[in-house]
């Protein structure tokens, strides 16, 4: 998808990604996403992640939803805990001036390394080998887009029920290729 065609979303770590706020209910998330022009489907789940909402723009053609939101009702946490943004057709999410979605992975890595050095942040390496700034509430990943590979991102807030951002991300979110 061309950059000019993507929705533009802001990101504040552990608070919100675009119109979605961590802790909001499934119903609130559906209202927010439908107001932004997306069509949503809800799914009830078993375990710590009790709900899933997938959202697509009406013009979406890919197999993966543009945005997938996961909800928790466990220990001291309730509501939106994790969301993923598709690299092929999802909204562009910007963190600290860095565009996270639909990028060439090596270019995003170079920007991350410059950013963590400039801001004196630490960095980690995901299970897939992607570099990311730690303690910022997101982990980048990659997925195929035809013959190319582009970046996508998984955002989470572990407050009240998990130890790390990675602990909040369901296995199926890691498996998107």
Task: Give the residues covered by each predicted segment.
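Short helix/turn-capping signatures at newly exposed starts of structured segments
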Residues: 1-177
